[in-house]
Each structure stands twice: as structure tokens, then as C-alpha cells.
């Protein structure tokens, strides 16, 4: 992994520590499903714009003037960890949106979003994250990544448990959303969610507020997905089972209720050098009355 120069002394100091720390998060997993898109997912929009490798290990979505495309997991889940490797659109990608997310698909839906907002050639992608809880959203954060996400595959992860939601890029935490339900803050905790991905035309808003439109002469636009892992509680109608702590539900254990010391340092590094928008800093948007969670601890 190549990081910006100003961070290199930090990387050298903690490189070994973060690897050791992150292995703890991964090593306790008992994989629910891993690898075959044909077995674990189904196409939800425009099958002609979805291409899956013969072995089912990789899948691409295509966007052209006719259509975008999407797919969804067959199962739904209540808590767990989801990892997906993604390679974004190269070159002129302005106006395009690649989304990877979990959603309950209900009117008052819960949703946990990664949205990759394309840009003109030579300008960086914006990664927007969002959390819907009981139908309420407006919780966007945006960062610039420290690498070119269209050059190679990178792993984007969601850890969702009874304590917190952690968004991760290559196992580095970039955003936290804690369960402050006891203080009146909505948190996704009752609705099972499917894992979904899509590629679509977002030129009305995605790049510079809709100023930069899709250049269709550069299409078709292709995003690639692969090497996913779903280690989560499969929904069978039993909320108490998925809420519990057990060997299978490792993510709910107390050790995953907050970040480790090393992860906190990485999180602060991302916030300092790569954060470009945080709804909790947008006083104008909320008429100087920020959402309650903005005044509560992040970890």
C-alpha cells in the first residue's frame, strides 16, 4: 500500500502493529459465503449489463446510455462483516456512481452505504459513506482516498454489530457510527439487510453538484467486483440470536465494541488528511442544530 509522504514515518512505526491488530478481526471469522457470485447473488437490474466470470469469482457491471446494472445477495443478514474487492472506472468517470451497500429495502429502511463518485480525468474519486437508520439519512461523509481506486482492486468492508458500524478500506477504519440508541439516536439494529452493488447514472448530482456530466463518448463504463466474503448472521426471523454473543457471532463480542489503539491512530490519520466533508460539521445544513450523535463519542 502506498500512502502520502507526510504519513510515511507513521506507517513505518505502526506497520507491523496494524497487521497484527487487524488479523484479530479477520482470524475469528467463520465464513458464511465466499467467492461465487452465481451462488450468493442474483441480478436485480439489467442482466445484459452484468458479466460474471466462468468460475463465478468475479463480476463486472456496465453503464452506457441504455442502462446501468445492479445485483443483490440472495440471503439477508443482521450484523456481521462484509468484505468486497472493487476496481473502479478508469479515466473520465464524472457523473457515474458505483455503489456497494447493505439495505433492508423497506419504506423506513436501514442502509449502510459506500458510494464512489466519479470525476473528470486526472481528478480523484470521492468516496461518500452514509447511514440510514429507521428511514432517516442525511449522514454523509466524504473522503479522498490515498490511492487510485481505478488502478487495482482494493477491499472495502462493513463491520456492523450491536455496538457500532465501522467502514474500512483495506482494513483501515475510515468512519465509525456508534450505537447510541439509549440516548435516542436511531441505529440499524432490527431490520435484516441484503448486500447490494450497482453502477448508475448520477450526473445530476455526483460530480461537483451535477456540473460535470457523463461523457458518453468515453463509455461504456465498467466497474469490477471480486473476492468478496460475507461473515454474518443469516436472517431466519430470530432477532435475539443475531443480537447475541457467541462463537459464531464473533462481531458482537465486547472486543469489537470499539477500535483498538492502533486502529484509532489510523482513523485519526484518515480524518486529518483525507476527510473533505462531515455532516457533523455542516452547521448551515442543519440550521445550527446538528444531529444528536454529532455531540456524542465516535469511539
Swiss-Prot record:
User: Where does it mainly reside?
Assistant: secreted
Q: Which Pfam families match?
A: Glyco_hydro_16, XET_C
Biological process terms from the Gene Ontology for this record are:
cell wall biogenesis; cell wall organization; xyloglucan metabolic process
Q: Where is the active site?
A: 111, 115
Q: Where is this site: Important for catalytic activity?
A: 113
Q: What is its EC number?
A: 2.4.1.207
Q: What UniProt keywords are attached to this protein's entry?
A: Apoplast, Cell wall, Cell wall biogenesis/degradation, Disulfide bond, Glycoprotein, Glycosidase, Hydrolase, Secreted, Signal, Transferase
Q: Which InterPro entries match?
A: Beta-glucanase/XTH (IPR044791), ConA-like_dom_sf (IPR013320), GH16 (IPR000757), XET_C (IPR010713), XTH (IPR016455)
| Residues modified by glycosylation | 51, 238
Query: Per its database record, what is this protein's job?
Result: Catalyzes xyloglucan endohydrolysis (XEH) and/or endotransglycosylation (XET). Cleaves and religates xyloglucan polymers, an essential constituent of the primary cell wall, and thereby participates in cell wall construction of growing tissues.
- Indicate the family of this protein: Belongs to the glycosyl hydrolase 16 family. XTH group 1 subfamily.
This protein's name: Probable xyloglucan endotransglucosylase/hydrolase protein 10
Annotated source species: Arabidopsis thaliana
Where is the organism placed in the taxonomic lineage, from the top?
Answer: Eukaryota, Viridiplantae, Streptophyta, Embryophyta, Tracheophyta
Gene of origin?
A: XTH10
